[in-house]
Amino acid sequence: MIVGLLFFATTINYLDRAILGVILPEIRDNFHFGLPIYGTIQMVFQIAYAGGSLLGGRLLDRYGTRIGYGIAATVWSLAATLNAFARSAFQFGLFRTVLGFGESANFPACSKAAAEWFPSEERATAMGIVNAGTNLANIFGPPLFILIAFTWGWQACFAIMGGLGFLWLPFWFLTYRLPRHEGAPTAAGAKVTIREVMKYKQAWGYGLAKFLTDPVWWFYLFWLPTYLTDVRHFTPQQRGTGLMIVYSISAVGALMGGVVSSFLIKRGWTVGKARKRTMLFCAVVMPACTLGVMVQDARLAVLLFGLATAAHQAWMTNLFIAPADVFPSQAVGSANGFGVCLGGLGGALFSGIIPGTVIPHIGYVPVLMGMSCFYIIAWFLIHRMMGDLEMVTFELRASATLAHSSA
């Protein structure tokens, strides 16, 4: 039941996030959306996503997963709905800023819930199911958005998808509770701060890995629909079908990434060895899969894009759960928030500013091929800074002292 709630929330989260990129070819002429302006809109979304993650992680650790996640879902659902009333690029940017701020708490909340409800050998499988929600949104979202836009207008896309979040909220508040063995959050746990988390190299290893690899997913999410239209000359229907194929393959990767590492742990591998070996495989195959941007055959390109996103999702399923392996539960939200913050900043740079600036001049090939190599660098950072993903000895007394001195 808990995994189902997290899965559907993540699906709604990504539906709200993906709308603008999918229907951009239909609305950009009316709003004068050139690639630089679109890149700027996505940049401010990701900066807000980065900033919101710091507050979101703190909110989750202080008030608990149930309240913190509920507040975040309310904010992002309201922001998604407001996009229906946008009448200029500035207004889209403003509403996307609020959307990014609210959506940033999603994966810190899911990771914290997984840490509260599942033992270490089951967490990656649980997160793989939750992470598959991103792909469900991307499988069915594009053709659904295009159908709604051509039937009732693009505004209906934002209004309908935003409303789904409000439908989810009552189920969340009525259902989610801490398991009995967890009990209520402790006073010490409530005083954990991101500043305390940042003292540990493991947090920086996680954050830098997110900084390097999150932008690749953002790039596919925000720029692939435009690429298929402008470079591959897909019709709206072909674009919807192509994206459905890409993210169907991606969903398999999200599930398999969790299943494989969980299987290895149950076979006697350490948590660190199982997670890192799975991620190393993904890092090695990623550059080959990105060759879709270079092949001539459009069908082969779509297949390779699907394999690339599958490799990313298998990687990310294991990376998402790493803070729950390394930090105690009362610090997981803050650790995840720190990582999501750096991931958002990386996204603003590598999938916002740079693509919007350089793609009109050099095209998509150098950008995608360059980013596909980030995974190897990220893996070495994880290996050096996070070690075997063993639980750190967290000095809660230092957190309490810091909180008292700042009062």
Spans of features found by a protein language model:
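Cytoplasmic helix-loop-helix junction between adjacent transmembrane helices
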Residues: 95-134
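Helix-loop-helix hairpin linking two adjacent transmembrane segments in secondary transporters
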Residues: 130-174
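Juxtamembrane intracellular "pre-TM" segments in multi-pass secondary transporters
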Residues: 179-207, 231
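A late C-terminal transmembrane helix in Major Facilitator Superfamily
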Residues: 324-361
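Extracytoplasmic gate region of multi-pass secondary transporters
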Residues: 20-21, 201-255, 312, 316, ...
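Helix-breaking motifs and short loop linkers at transmembrane-helix boundaries and internal kinks
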Residues: 32, 64, 85-91, 119, ...
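Residue-level signature of mid-helix packing/kink "hotspots" within the transmembrane helices
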Residues: 18, 46-54, 138-139, 247-251, ...
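Conserved MFS/SLC helix-loop-helix module at the cytosolic interface between two early adjacent transmembrane helices
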Residues: 51-90
